[in-house]
């Protein structure tokens, strides 16, 4: 991208986030600040918030152009000449292919990331991401292997597979992992981004058992330890599934450690239901916690549910973070 945009020193590209309403607000705040500091610059806004709410950004006088997530892959085409339209955002669900590109910028590090898929077919009630990224689109296996080969030739020792919903890789996530490990037997460390507990099958457990170069830390997107809250979130696992999964992995890899994302104060969550999350952390042996107080996101079903007071959400998040700090005790 830097090569494509070389010579355009007066261009500012803002890649926005839409995960929460607060993230979107901060994006708008950043755009205003950039305009004040760069009055003559051309400001192009793209990314997830631009895809979900293009009109909000187009109405900002500080913004010159709004591009959707698909259009940003061809950003040089849209900024090379003046355009009559200020907003160019296509329907993200109309795209069924994945743009091939190698993620760069890992110079000086041991670990590099390879994105294996984009989008998500699930509709968790708190999440706007599918409307920003579209449905699941998997990168061709040959392209993934090519990228890994190139990164290994550059001297990287750790490869981390990532994606919006990496476990939904088609035709098979476990099959892809097996192919990578068979193709690169001397790969020092294969790691994973966030993993969906509902999608990890016995084939994956067997791979963890067989290949010592699978990194023994596994990060799951659990979100809650209460089955009713999980159901209202439209998650596909139960607390029992999580406990069993951790036990299975630990049985074949005693050195395994686990981390997870958790949302505290999801709509309708009671004190007892929150306590089930606290208990799950201990029962499953989860030691690295990414804890977030629930944040309403307009356009999601959860935003229409009865809300937990903000101060209660923050207090529960504080309690769970403290629990995480003592997990290794």
Feature map (PLM): residue ranges:
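Residue-level recognition of specific faces of alpha-helices
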Residues: 30, 112-113, 192, 229-232, ...
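Contiguous mid-protein beta-loop-alpha structural module that forms a pocket-lining wall or clamp
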Residues: 269, 285-286
């Amino acid at each position: 991208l830097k090569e494509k945009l070389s010579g355009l020193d007066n261009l500012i590209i803002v890649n926005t986030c839409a995960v929460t309403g607060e993230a979107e607000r901060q994006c708008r705040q950043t755009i205003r600040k950039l305009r004040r500091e760069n009055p003559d610059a051309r400001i192009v806004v793209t990314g997830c918030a631009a895809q979900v709410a293009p009109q909000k950004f187009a109405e900002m006088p500080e913004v010159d152009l709004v591009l959707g997530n698909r259009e940003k892959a061809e950003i040089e085409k849209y900024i090379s000449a003046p355009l009559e339209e200020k907003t160019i955002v296509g329907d993200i669900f109309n795209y069924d292919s994945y743009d091939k590109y190698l993620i760069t910028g890992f110079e000086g590090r041991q670990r590099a990331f390879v994105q294996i898929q984009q989008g998500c077919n699930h509709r968790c009630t708190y999440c706007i991401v599918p409307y920003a990224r579209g449905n699941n689109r998997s990168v061709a296996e040959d392209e993934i292997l090519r990228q890994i080969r190139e990164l290994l030739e550059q001297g990287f020792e750790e490869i981390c597979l990532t994606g919006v919903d990496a476990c939904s890789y088609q035709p098979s996530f476990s099959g892809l992992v097996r192919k990578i490990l068979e193709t690169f037997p001397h790969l020092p460390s294969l790691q994973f981004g966030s993993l969906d507990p509902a999608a990890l099958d016995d084939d994956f457990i067997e791979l963890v058992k067989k290949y010592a170069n699978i990194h023994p830390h596994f990060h799951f997107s659990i979100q809650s330890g209460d089955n009713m809250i999980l159901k209202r979130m439209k998650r596909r696992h139960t607390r029992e599934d999580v406990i069993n999964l951790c036990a299975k992995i630990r049985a074949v890899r005693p050195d395994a450690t686990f981390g997870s994302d958790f949302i505290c104060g999801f709509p309708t969550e009671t004190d007892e239901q929150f306590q089930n999350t606290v208990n799950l952390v201990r029962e499953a042996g989860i030691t690295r916690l990414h804890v977030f107080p629930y944040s309403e996101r307009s356009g999601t079903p959860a935003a229409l549910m009865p809300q937990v007071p903000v101060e209660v959400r923050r207090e529960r998040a504080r309690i769970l973070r403290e629990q995480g700090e003592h997990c290794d005790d």
